[in-house]
Amino acid sequence: MSALAKGWILYRPEPGLVKQESYEVDRLLEVAPRHGYDLAVVDPDDVQLLVNAEGADAVTVDGEEVPLPDFVIPRLGSMTGYFALAVIRQLEHLGVFCLNGADAVALAQDKLHQLQVLADHGFPVPKTLLVKFPVDADMVEETIGFPVVVKTLVGTQGSGVYLSEDKQGLDDLLQFVQANNPDARLVLQQFLSESRGRDVRILAVGTRIVSAMERIAESGFKSNYSQGGTARPFAWGPKNEFSVAEVMRVLGMDMAG
């Protein structure tokens, strides 16, 4: 019987969470052995970085030297800081396959940069405005219009996303944000009314769609399942396959959703 391929899930539990592992991480750990993989969760903060020209076949994790894994799956989301990206880059330098690599992970963190890259390659994207305080609501109305979506540049599972129906609502929201975090990085985005409370989430590996679902909000405009929405299967076609493959190629991603 051949040995199981060894992999790491780079994951850092968020401080204060009662449930230390996310559902996605738990599921990966559960199903991996059935498919010939031996997975372990590694906190990137526990990895000691040593850069040299000779390479290595082992790294130090939590004070102990361990063999390099065959592959790494970063599952850090908005918690991906400089050190975590450096760990991913170092593992890539040592020949470990990372799904995704450091450049793709960094790009996935920055919503505005993603849109810049996609727009540069001709993909349709909603009008998006990077703002700093104070924000001119009249200018927002002229360039984007209302309602307008307000997003933090870093956020997942629907956090940091708000909908302002009019200028007064936008002013009230931005005044609150400025009072609590004057250095907040925000984008204002065109609201696509046809997608209010629903969207399609496609999961892909390589250039192939492996799963797709339509997400529907119970109330409000956020369709995230983690925000109380529901989900049902979505039947995708060749047009979806082509679009997904092109987006992943442009963004340099091996896995996306």
Model-derived regions: residue spans:
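ATP-binding N-terminal substructure of ATP-dependent carboxylate-amine bond-forming enzymes
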Residues: M1-L99, A104
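Residue-level detector of anion-binding/catalytic polar loops
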Residues: D38, F97, P124, P147, ...
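A long amphipathic alpha-helix within ATP-dependent nucleotide-binding catalytic cores
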Residues: F221-G257
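A short glycine-rich, hydrophobically flanked beta-strand micro-motif that places a catalytic Asp/Glu
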Residues: L188-Q190, V200, M253-G257
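Active-site nucleotide/adenylate-binding loops and adjacent lid/helix of ATP-dependent enzymes
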Residues: S2-L29, V66-P67, L91-G95, D103-Q189, ...
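Beta-strand scaffold of nucleotide-dependent catalytic cores
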Residues: V140, Y162, L173-Q175, R198-I216, ...
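Generic beta-strand structural signal
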Residues: N100, L130, A204-V205
